[in-house]
């Protein structure tokens, strides 16, 4: 499993744990819902800024998005 696959899996895991839809997380982050969907499917690679924003809105430490 590569780092993008790990990130994608963890993004979805933490989003669901917080009971957020892709739409709601996108709204909180000021992103488009399709961007969140693409990240979760591993189609897009997030920028460092996007990772920072997502972790902030999910209320988790950044490193948790990259742990197997």
Q: Predicted regions: what is each one?
A:
Residues 59-68:
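Short C-terminal boundary/hinge segments that cap the last helix of small helical domains
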Residues 31-45:
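Recognition helix of helix-turn-helix/homeodomain-like DNA-binding domains
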Residues 43-56:
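Short, basic-rich loop-to-helix N-cap that marks the start of a DNA-contacting helix
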Residues 11, 25-26, 36-39, 65:
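Conserved hydrophobic/aromatic packing and binding residues within compact polymer-binding modules
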Residues 9-28:
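Short basic helix-loop element that most often maps to the first helix and adjoining turn
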Residues 11, 22, 33, 48-51:
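Helix-turn-helix DNA-binding elements, focusing on the entry/boundary residues of the two helices
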Residues 1-6:
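A detector for short, charged/polar N-terminal pre-domain segments
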